Amino acid sequence: MRVKRGFSAHRRHKKYLEMAKGFRGGRSRLYRTAREAVERSLVYAYIGRKQRKREFRKLWILRINAGAREHGLSYSKMMAGLSQAGIMLNRKILAELAVKQKEDFAKLVEIAKNQVH
C-alpha cells in the first residue's frame, strides 16, 4: 500500500506553528519562516540558560560588595574573612541578606572584619 506523507507533514507543520505562537507577522503564520524563527529561538533559549547563571552570580557579587563597602570592607576581604571564620554561606544567600536583612549582614561583616584584621 502506498504511504502518503500528508498526515505527518501536517503534524510537523502544526508543531512548529504552535511553538511560533506569539511571534510577529509571517514568523507565526508561514511554516518555513516559523520553523527558522523557532529553531533560532531555541538556540537563544539554550544560550540564555547558560548566561542566566553568570548574570545572577555577577548581581550577587555586586550586592555583597555594596553591602560590605557600607561597613568599610571590600568584597574580596569580606569573602576571605568569612572563609577564615568557617562561615559557609553562598553568594545568593549573602546577597539576600545584604538587601533584605541589613542587621544580620552587618554582623557577618563584623565577623569577617575581625578575621581579616
Curated annotation (Swiss-Prot):
InterPro entries: Ribosomal_bL20 (IPR005813), RIBOSOMAL_L20_CS (IPR049946), Ribosomal_protein_bL20_C (IPR035566)
Protein keywords: Ribonucleoprotein, Ribosomal protein, RNA-binding, rRNA-binding
Claim: Ribonucleoprotein is one of the keywords in the record: yes
A GO CC term attached to the entry: ribosome
Record carries keyword Ribonucleoprotein: yes
Highest taxon of the lineage: Bacteria
GO MF terms, alphabetically ordered: rRNA binding; structural constituent of ribosome
Record GO biological process: ribosomal large subunit assembly; translation
Pfam families the record matches: Ribosomal_L20
Function: Binds directly to 23S ribosomal RNA and is necessary for the in vitro assembly process of the 50S ribosomal subunit. It is not involved in the protein synthesizing functions of that subunit.
Family per record: Belongs to the bacterial ribosomal protein bL20 family.
Protein name: Large ribosomal subunit protein bL20
